[in-house]
Amino acid sequence: MFYLLNVEKNNIINILFNGYNNLKKRPKLGDFLILENKDSLLLTRVEEENYFLDYNDLKNEILKFMEIGFDKLGELEKEELYRLTYKVIPLTTLSKKERKITGSYRNIPLHLETTIRKPSFEEMLYFLNYEYLKDEFKDFNKFKEFLEENKINENNIKEKEKELLKIFNGEIISYYQNLPVIFNVNKFLAKRTGVFARTGYGKSNAIKIILLKILKLAYFKAFSDKEIKNALIVVYDVNGEYAFTNQQNTGFQEVFKDKEDDFLVLTNKRESYVFVRPLKINFAELSTNEIAEILINAFGEEIKAYTYFEEIDNKIWKNLFALAVSKVKDESKKEEKDFEKKEVEKVSDFIIKYLRKLLQIISSELKFIFEEKLKEMEKEGKFNVVKVVIDLEKEVKLSEELQKKLKKAALQEVNIGAIEWRLKKLLYNLYHPNGLSSNDVKNLIENKKMVILDLSSADDWSGNIISRYFTKKIFEYNQEFFLKNEKYHVILTFEEAQNLLDDINKNNDIFVRVAKEGRKFNIALIAITQQPSSISQKILSQMDNFLAFHLLNEDDINALSKANNHYSGLIKFLLKYEPIKGQCFFYSAPEQPFVIQMKFNLFDDELEKFKKEMEELKKKEKEEEQKLFQDAII
């Protein structure tokens, strides 16, 4: 039925298929074939299909068939019409001697020694998931024996999932032609992952499932590295798909119904859940150096006033905010966590008003008088920046000498105005007393399981500033943990990643730093994009995991193929011309030797499984607590 023809220089193998009496066994594009000899099984994939006859001979046979009819053709003529050739590419090798996959392909298959056939159910399951087999089952014979003993076959595979998982280090993440595809989501820790797809083809569903599997690891304490103290998932949610459940969408709030302390959503939507905080920054808890850096990122240039702004002591800055918040609380009769736009703007106006006066003072010779007055007040057990500013202002009005000193201030009206409008815009749009602070970020890394930044609830400008600030603090804290030999993993999941990772040369850009250096500090990156061609090739080519769904743009497909040669040939063709929702072409370095085509389950179905598993875990924990209690009594 199959015959080996030849092997081309680029290792493409040409096979002849005599199809007249075997049409049901005719392989399709993308199917796997095995080339077997006395030493090994070589797994190959069908890349191309052609007629065996050349064009002119085929044309003559077809004309003859049209003239006299198919029934009157001789057997040999019929066979000639149904002879097909296939180009197949080698993927990996199973050594019969070692009874395990070697991954290498060095020898040309010999015509007389090679049998060509479709793989069996056991062989295909073994080839697809070899990387995740437990050591004792990496021997193919033992693997087969286990399947036979447990009566696992292609007809009952879905019913036998629990038994099957006993031999794998991983989870069933998807299926390929009714065969389970195993994946160990530990591989997402401290790794770079690229997810590529047009809108509507299942990338969000796939990512939700992967994140759910990571959460399962966290709750079952099943990380491969037992030194991991915590793993925090952070989602930069551009389209508002991950947090809340509504008619169109199931959010992660369903996962944390009984574990709300592990979950945080930062959003500007009016939600009353206990796990919700505003998508804002509490600038009172930031140093003036940090705020100056945010201002530079937000407005793109450094101005003279920033130098003097950074000289403002953190104690002074905090006191200014405390006075502003206290005043607005008294006026509004609201707690600061309940402040709305009107209250935030009043606090901001108060800050700006006295910041103007402060900058004039500290950029002049009055700075020393101001500092002495603060010290005197502090000795009395008090600290009120505004009172000192007002008192000094009164003294200046009564003293020509002090007025002259103030006029010599380095910052004049125009300089102060430049920082004033910038800071005002920043505070109006991004400040809230219940917003994030630096210490909050550290606490999240140490204690939370998932944080979602609902960027759909903010404009692009505000969302970008908060995302950069949050990412920078994570990077800095994980650097600290690394130096202390403490292992806290963070998985940063970015939608619209092409807007963040377009230029590898932006060395000071925090997103590029995460992509280049994050792995060292246990920061994983999941970059989701519709436009892989817009991401720097230097970043794209360094991805460890690739999940590619349907892409239409030629530049995007070529960029992916250039970054990872496994996405060439037939895979490249299918990415463009098979727009099947949920179909994914998955590759993971370094152990997985070829792209696996698969279709993800639905997130809602996986969520139901997760809930049942969590109920079982809760029941087990309760039984253990009762046992400990009984033992203590005895």
Question: Which ranges hold each PLM region?
Answer:
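Pre-Walker A adenine-sensing motif
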Residues: 176-186, 440-441
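Conserved ATP-driven motor cores of ASCE-family P-loop NTPases powering translocation/secretion/packaging/pilus
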Residues: 77, 514-597
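N-terminal pre-Walker A segment at the start of P-loop NTPase domains
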Residues: 128-181
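Conserved ASCE P-loop ATPase motor domains encompassing nucleic-acid-directed helicases/translocases
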Residues: 1-138
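P-loop NTPase motor domains
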Residues: 226-228, 240-251, 272-513, 584-588
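Conserved lysine of the Walker
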Residues: 203
